[in-house]
Amino acid sequence: MGGIKKFKKGEKGENLKFITRNEAVKKLQISLKIFRKLCILKGIHPRDPKKKFKGKHKTYYYSKDIKYLQNEKVLEIIRARKVFKDREKKLINKKQFGALKNLKENRPMITLDHIIKERYPTFQDALKDLDDCLSLIHLFANMDASAKVRENQILACERLAREFQYYIIQSKSLRKVFVSVKGVYYQADVMGETITWITPLNYLSKKEKEVDYGVMISFLEFYQALMKFVNYRLFTSIGLTYPPTIDDAKLRKCDSLINIFESKPQQQTKTNNTTKKSKSTTAAAAATTPVDPKLKKLEEKISKINSKEEKEIKEQIVEEDTNMLQVNSSGISKDFEDLVGNESDNIPKIMDVTTLFKGFHFYISREVPRHMLEFVILSFGGRVSFPGSGDKVKEVNQSITHQIVDRSNSVKVHNTREYIQPQWVFDSVNSKLLLPYSEYTIGVIPPAHLSPFVEYEEDSYIPARKQALDALINSKEFADAKINTNAEQDDDNDNDNDNRKQVDSDGESDDEDDEDLEHLETRYTEELRKEQSKKRKSSEVDDDDEEEEDGEEDGEEEEEEEDGEEESESESESEQVAKPVLTKKQRDELNKQKQAEEDTKLAELMIRKKDKWIYNKVKETNQQRATANQTLLEKRNKVESGKDVNGNVKVAPQPKKPAPLVKKSQQKQQQASKKQKK
């Protein structure tokens, strides 16, 4: 008879899937510090089981992960290091310095190559996990040396960060930049993967006691090994040698990125010569040595396979050439030239963003943060120079087209260049066009620096600056768009006149602007006329059927409409006379009030339905308080003006007549007479 199979305790169940941290440490026979380091290197994280059998306040791991750690090579090297330390102590006590020197040469070293290959089987997987790696390396590159963080680690991080930046400059793969309080956010497209990382701002970093630097350094060791692999692959993909030759003296002086590196593209001629020499040497060696018949057969088979592969590759190339479209000089296929015709000028041309600053020479002043601006400008095709750079370009040089300044007082103005604030560089990179200089000149408060990582929806709130930038981007030649910082000030005549007087960033003159405006006005009037004519035609068709019936009524209505129009004209004239001219302060106050009302409306929309009753209660109480305060103020004003609380005029009270003065002796006599009468 078959029955239910019973298991002993410890053979099956969810309890066996998990293991506590103390049990894992005992099983591996290592300290807690080494266990943490191993988990960080191997990517093993603590788990949260549904039923915590051995206590709620304990950390649990998968038992499979701990078994996986038992066969790790790093564990063997750690145990070998313990033995090495014991031998070192013995040799020091015995004063055998020769043997000690040989022992130090054979010291066991930890290598992380096999761990990186296990965790990232493909290069795309490594690129996906590069965000945290770059952020941590840039953080340690900007730190100061201390007892917890060594100088060698800081220099290695700085070198790796500069290598990655140099690759991005050469490949021109930077796309977005955003400066915030936390730091500077960058985003780049590297081999089809979007990588975003943050670099800290230049400040004196304080070592906080709450931070566990041991855990951070163990992460850093792994990320340094990963970054070397990634940089090697990226450099070789462009044709650069790795590791590149870096001038350490220039790196310590904080010289420019291009001057620090001396790496050149790999010369194909040298490689071809070396391959030819190697082939000739191998052929000579093969001629002298006796050849086995088996080896000959193998060589013949390999040559046949190679010839087949070459034929297949050639056939594929021929097919691709036949399938490729023959493109015209204007970028249009020859098959579709007839369809396009004369309207080829209206086709929008795609702008190459990587050459946004091509032909511009930027001079960065001393007060401006140089490293991030240099990185951004160079990655978009510009040229950079600054005081103390290797170029030896002075501020007076006439080749400089733009000077980035953050102080308005200490600047000698040159008429041959544009003076801009650092924000212009970041905003023009994010908007993918050169913004007008008038908003970023010296002494002017620049517009809002919007985040390029936020995607605005149609239903959500869109800032006024974003709307203005969209209008600039969507316009044909970036001339018809007008930038208004406040969308509600469009009706003000002063702002319209100022915008008309401003010169466009493309260098167009005032006459050309007037011609464009006239052209737009004529187009607008023509469209209005067409619409009005369509409406009239439709109304005439409907009115022809009803003319006979409603002839008399139409006459009366026309008379009433004329009377109403005369009254409305008189009212509008009176309103124009009565309306006072508002000052700028009053306009600003009105705009602030409108903005506050819009903000409250948006906040009300964002509140959840569950929490809306609380908001309504608070709103009612605030309104009651406001009304009570207003009534008290009104009563106080009435009392101060000499009225009652109800608003009635107070009657002044008549003064009482003073009682006649009576002496004390007379009072006593009067009292005595009263007593006698009684």
Swiss-Prot record:
InterPro entries: BRCT_dom, BRCT_dom_sf, PES
Biased composition (Low complexity): 269-289, 649-678
Protein name: Pescadillo homolog
GO BP field: maturation of 5.8S rRNA from tricistronic rRNA transcript (SSU-rRNA, 5.8S rRNA, LSU-rRNA); maturation of LSU-rRNA from tricistronic rRNA transcript (SSU-rRNA, 5.8S rRNA, LSU-rRNA)
Biased segments, Acidic residues type: 505-518, 541-574
Family to which the UniProt record says this protein belongs: Belongs to the pescadillo family.
UniProt keyword annotation of Hydrolase present: no
Bias-annotated ranges (Basic and acidic residues): 519-531, 585-601, 633-643
Coiled-coil boundaries: 581-640
Main location: nucleus
Presence of keyword Plastid: no
Chain intervals for the UniProt region annotation (Disordered): 265-289, 485-601, 626-678
Gene Ontology CC entries for this record: nucleoplasm; PeBoW complex; preribosome, large subunit precursor
GO molecular function: ribonucleoprotein complex binding; RNA binding
HAMAP family (alphabetical): Pescadillo
Subcellular location: Nucleus, Nucleolus; Nucleus, Nucleoplasm
UniProt KW keywords: Coiled coil, Nucleus, Ribosome biogenesis, rRNA processing
